[in-house]
């Protein structure tokens, strides 16, 4: 089988993977279960590869998957207003150029201690 079910229906699983992928692109490091980390690694690698392509079609494909969440918000004193950056903008303007010379392997999974409540194997997934 090419993917893990993660104990969810297909729509729930797809939504969870989209959320975790978006969170990883925004925060660049998240703590989750080992199985989830191994699954979102696939989607994050695809999103960064789309970001490296950088054309309109790649941007639209990434926009169809990445949630429209605010990645950062800055105050511009000269214009007296707030400017925000979405996860998609961060992917194409900050993350993708960082990996321009790298062919794959954009993420790292570090195993940590089991979760206290149910002893689920936990891991930290981060961008290299």
UniProtKB/Swiss-Prot annotation:
GO molecular function terms noted in the UniProt entry: structural constituent of ribosome
Keyword Magnesium: no
PROSITE patterns assigned to the protein according to its UniProt record, in alphabetical order: RIBOSOMAL_L17
Signal sequence bounds: none
Keywords: Ribonucleoprotein, Ribosomal protein
Coiled-coil segments: none
Listed InterPro entries: Ribosomal_bL17, Ribosomal_bL17_CS, Ribosomal_bL17_sf
One annotated Gene Ontology cellular component of this protein: cytosolic large ribosomal subunit
UniProt-listed GO biological process terms: translation
Family from the record: Belongs to the bacterial ribosomal protein bL17 family.
NCBIfam families, per database record: L17
Complex formation: Part of the 50S ribosomal subunit. Contacts protein L32.
Name of this chain's protein: Large ribosomal subunit protein bL17
